Amino acid sequence: PKFETDESKPVFQEIKRRLDLQGKQGSELNGNRISILEATSSSNGLVKTFSRNIEAHVLSPVKKEGEASNAAQADVNDASLVIRWTVKVFGGMNRIMLGGDATVEVWDRIWQNYQNNTDKLSWHILLAPHHCAIDAIARKNKDGKYEYSENALNALGQVISDGFVVSSSKEIKHNDDLLPSWEAKQKYLGMLKDADEARFLNPDTRANAPLLYSPLQDDKPEPVVF
């Protein structure tokens, strides 16, 4: 499949710029760094420690998913990046699951690999995969209707304590849209304690959401420069 799109071109250009700087003066300055992580053949993924307070566990893709994504009829989202971040702040441990656009096939595989080690899938904050699309947690049956995958729901449902789910999408309305999906939202709400709607955050309706950053920043989060 063709991975480069009009939207991705600036990202690839920036990656190339940073790669070209490697080994040269200035490569470690803010805005010039880059880390290269190779897809592993191990079903246990890859753990990368960036500092004593930040760790990334790459759950997907593994090599077979990366190779499959090169097939002519492949779904490129089968090679989407899934990372569970662990961030330690003031002695506390915060776990953040970023599922990219990973499909239900990927989440099925992740559950099969980690069902006996579910701590590796636990989170305080979950970014709903594929902008809260239904195809991250369900697949079509022979009649063309979506059936939910218990494996995928189990993989995504390892919430710690109360937890938050964030949907990076337009407002999720009660209709038959597949991306974002109202039905998928209900599944994520079911993962949260008491199905608390206030803990499901959507940027398109953020006027009703709790502030997750300082109001002293002119109501804008600070950019992260790496």
Identify the meaning behind each predicted range.
Residues 1-105, 170-226:
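Flexible, acidic/histidine-containing loops and adjacent segments that form or flank the divalent-metal
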Residues 105-111, 115-206:
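Long, structured stretches of catalytic cores involved in phosphate-ester chemistry, encompassing
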